[in-house]
């Protein structure tokens, strides 16, 4: 939870109510706890076992994705949080590559995400990592809804792959330039 709280504080500092909105925050936390309990959340560790981040997967969010999206063809990624200390190191890109590899191994064509509709910087980040905007949904009870997907065959960091062994923490491999 500390990573989540830290992320909420960082977002609040830049003027965003993402993840701390009083109307949607408690539902989001409950959903995240369910991902953890169901074994659909991974912790990202460095070689010293320091926590660098976390990521979850889950079923298609039916507030956004529907049958015409061919739900079964995608891996749905949620709650990618990178610690402040690890921000800007490329770990997010490694995790997205990992998710693409898992999706491909499962025979899925897409890695799909949704993010806050007003998080334009985050949307540009994902587009820079190979995601294409599919559409934006705006149900009245949600503030997320910017939907994007990336082909599961898209691997941007082939020399720094994370292990796809399920149930294990995601360990970041050391490199000469850890900031790469």
Residue ranges and their predicted role:
Residues 96, 103-115:
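Conserved GNAT acetyl-CoA-binding A-motif
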Residues 54-83, 87:
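Conserved acyl-donor/pantetheine-binding loop and adjacent beta-alpha core of acyl/acetyltransferases
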Residues 38-55:
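Conserved beta-hairpin
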Residues 82, 88-101, 124-128:
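Conserved acetyl-CoA-binding loop-helix of GNAT-fold acetyltransferases
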Residues 126-136:
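Conserved acetyl-CoA-binding loop of GNAT-fold acetyltransferases
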Residues 27-43, 76:
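A short helix-loop-beta-strand connector motif used in the catalytic cores of GNAT acetyltransferases and
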Residues 113-123, 139-144:
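Conserved beta-strand-loop-alpha-helix junction that forms the acyl-donor binding cleft
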Residues 5-31:
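Conserved GNAT-fold acetyl-CoA-binding loop/helix
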């Amino acid at each position: 939870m500390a990573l989540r709280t830290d992320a909420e504080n960082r977002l609040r500092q830049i003027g965003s109510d993402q993840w701390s909105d009083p109307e949607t925050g408690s539902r989001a936390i409950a959903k995240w706890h369910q991902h953890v309990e169901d074994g659909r959340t991974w912790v990202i560790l460095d070689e010293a076992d320091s926590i660098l981040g976390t990521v979850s997967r889950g079923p298609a969010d039916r507030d956004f994705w529907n049958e015409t999206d061919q739900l079964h063809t995608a891996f749905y990624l949620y709650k990618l949080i990178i610690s402040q200390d690890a921000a800007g190191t490329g770990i997010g890109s490694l995790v997205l590559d990992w998710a693409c590899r898992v999706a491909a191994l499962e025979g899925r064509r897409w890695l799909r995400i949704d993010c806050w509709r007003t998080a334009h910087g985050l949307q540009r980040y994902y587009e820079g990592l190979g995601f294409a905007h599919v559409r934006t949904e705006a149900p009245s009870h949600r503030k997320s809804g910017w939907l994007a997907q990336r082909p599961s065959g898209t691997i941007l960091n082939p020399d720094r792959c994370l292990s796809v062994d399920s149930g294990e923490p995601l360990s970041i491999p050391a490199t000469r330039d850890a900031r790469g």
